[in-house]
Amino acid sequence: MNKVLIIGSGFSGATIARLLAEENIKVKIIDDRKHIGGNCYDERDEKTGINVHVYGPHIFHTDNEDVWNFVNKYGTFQPYTTRLKANAKGQIYSLPVNLHTINQYYKTALSPTEARKLIASKGDQTINDPQSFEEQALKFVGEDLYKTFFYGYPKKQWGMEPKEIPASVLKRLPVRFNYDDNYFFHKFQGIPRDGYTPLFQNLLNHPNIEFELGKKVNRATVEELITSEQYGHVFFSGAIDHFYDYEFGMLQYRTLDFEKFYSEDDDYQGCVVMSYCDEDVPYTRVTEHKYFTPWEEHKGSVLYKEFSRSCDKEDIPYYPVRLVSGNSIWNKYEQKAKEETNITFIGRLATYRYLDMDVCIKEAIECAQLYIKNNKE
């Protein structure tokens, strides 16, 4: 088979690289950052020795056993239960919204059945087919909980009114009528014991894989490489608008700024992530990184305040911004991508979707398997 070029070394690109390499296909990975792993990259904080998720919290969770088995080949996963808290109107609540949250908020002692009836009575039953985040929230939890927990936070995160955000975003946020405070409900949940970076090092440790880090590419660069180095196919996992030199304009993404600070206290906030739901607090959440590795012991603590803002060309894009009204610019890029014969677009940025890590891996496995099947010699 021909050599393959992969742009990006996050889970999408790295998974394809490994699977192709095991089929004796020569693979070259190019990444514009000076490290592998994409946004999953982590490193030891020099001052405290705590392992820091440099680009924000990454907890692995999935119901897909094949994906779980795949990542466990390259790193030992420590079971991990994600328990988050929310700071709203001067009170600390459990997230996701559960029976404890409901009883605390309404100052009640309701049973699960009673809580279901209460929330059902609060919901706006005139909304039959919610299209926006706001409609989804009003229909299923009512105005009280919406205004307290689901208005200010997404407005800060996405930079727009919740009525402009698609309803699908809220479907990622569960509501429970028991006291379960595990944020995720998936069968498999964990964090690599040694960190994500060593996992990626193991994943990409193969004689058929080579790297070039710290190099940006676009459509013209890729065409030159295809010609000069005889690549048979390209898998691209970067921002699709950058790839096409913003031919149809820049797509909307959100980027994140992190403000690092230290505490002499061994435990600063009592949980891994504290979300700040009030609109007048400029940051969305605070992450205390030592909670990612409770099996380790460190003096003091290192934390990140997380600020969300609109993404410029020189920023790192994190979240694609999908609008209820649609996106004509994305439609043009999507059509152009479909016309490519030797380039496959993979991952969150290239396909302009909000994807969890396990979905990126699942789709990458499918892409690799299809390529191998179609190129058997």
UniProtKB/Swiss-Prot annotation:
Its EC number is 5.4.99.59. One of its GO terms (molecular function) is flavin adenine dinucleotide binding. It holds the Pfam family GLF. It catalyses: dTDP-alpha-D-fucose = dTDP-alpha-D-fucofuranose. It comes from the Bacteria. Catalyzes the conversion of dTDP-alpha-D-fucopyranose to dTDP-alpha-D-fucofuranose. This is a step in the biosynthesis of D-fucofuranose, a component of E.coli O52 O antigen. This is dTDP-fucopyranose mutase. The lineage of its organism: Bacteria, Pseudomonadati, Pseudomonadota, Gammaproteobacteria, Enterobacterales.
